[in-house]
Amino acid sequence: MKIAIVTPAAARVRNGNRNTAERWATFLRQQGHRVCVQVEWDGRCADLMLALHARRSHASIKRFFECCPQTPLVVVLTGTDLYRDIRNNYSAQESMRLATRLVVLQEMGLNELALDLRAKTHVIYQSARSIKPVAPLKKLFEVCVIGNLREEKDPFRCALAAALLPKSSKIHIHHMGAAVNDVMARQALVLMERIPRYRWIGESPHWQVRKRLARSRIMVISSYMEGGANVVSEALSAGVSVIASDVSGNIGMLGADYAGYYPCGNEYALAEMLYHAETNPEFYDLLKKQCAQRKEYVQPQLESAKLAQLIAAVTGQTISSPSVPIPWPRPGKAV
C-alpha cells in the first residue's frame, strides 16, 4: 500500500509529532508499505492517509477527503487536540468527523471523546528502544527535564521547585529542549542566574538526550497538557523514575495508581516530592518499581503490532507485524 503520513512538523524540527511520524513510517515500511512523510499532503494518490494533529493538519485532511472520499483516513489526536482544540475549534472537530479512524496515544485520551468517536478510536502507546544503563553521578542527585520551552509544557516549574529545596539537597536540574521564542530563552537564562541548581542545556542531539536521561535519577514532566509524551516512554524504557504533573495524558501513560504525581502548576508540591525521592529510599524504590511495571506498554514490537492492526482495521486486510527484532529510526534531535 501507498501511505501518506502528514505531520505539521517539518523534517528539521524534532518534536514529538515528527518523531512519531518518522517512527511509524519505519514500522510501516518494515510491514511492506510505501510511505511518504509530508508536512502538507502533496495531492498524489495514496491508499491511506495518516494525519497527526487534527487542527494543524486540517487542510490536508479535508483536501484528501474531498479528493479521495472512499479512501481510509486516520487522524492521530495530539495533546493540544485532545485537551483544548476539540472543544472549541471547528477545524479539529471537522477533522475528527471526516476520519475513518482516530488514534489516541494513551488510554485516558478516550475519556475526552464523545461516545460515537470512541467507537472508531484506537489506542497506540508510543514506544522507545532500550537504553544502555549509565551510572548516575555520585556527587549530584541529577534530575532531567526533556522538552522544548513551550507554554503547554510549563517548562520552568521544575526550576521554580529547585529554588525551594533545602541547602542540604544535592538535586540539580538539567533541562534539554529548544526555546520556541526569545522570551522563553531569556526567561531560562534569568532562572539559571538566579537558581544555581537549574541549568538549561538547550536543544541537543538525540543520543545526548538519551545518555543524560539514562544517568538521571528522576525525569520530571510538568506539562499542562500531554497527548501521550514519548519522553515518558523513553524514561520507562531506560528504567528512570518519573515525577509527573497530574494531568490526564500523564496518568494515561503511568497509570492511575502511580505514586509520582504532583498537582499541576504547583512548584511547592513538586519540590516536596523531589526532595522526598532524594531522601526516602522506600519512596524512590516504589517509583522505580511502578515504572518498571509500565515498561511493557512502550515496547517497539507492541507499537508496531498495534499499527498493523489499525491498518488492517481500516483496509479490511490482514497484516502481520514482523517477527524479527525491529531496527529503530534515529532522529537527529529529540526534544
Task: Describe each model-derived feature in a short phrase.
Residues 135-165, 173-176:
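Conserved donor-binding/catalytic core segment of Leloir-type glycosyltransferases
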Residues 96, 203-204, 211-216:
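Short alpha-helical donor nucleotide-sugar binding micro-motif in glycosyltransferases
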Residues 241-244:
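Short hydrophobic beta-strand element within catalytic cores of glycosyltransferases
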Residues 15-16, 133, 282-312, 316:
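A charged, aromatic-enriched C-terminal amphipathic alpha-helix characteristic of glycosyltransferases
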Residues 97-123, 128-131:
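A short, active-site helix/loop in glycosyltransferases that binds the activated sugar's phosphate group
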Residues 224-225:
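Aromatic "clamp/platform" in nucleotide-sugar-dependent glycosyltransferases that forms part
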Residues 256-267, 276-281:
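Conserved acidic donor-binding segment of nucleotide-sugar-dependent glycosyltransferases
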Residues 186-207:
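Nucleotide-activated donor-binding/catalytic signature segment of Leloir-type glycosyltransferases, i.e.
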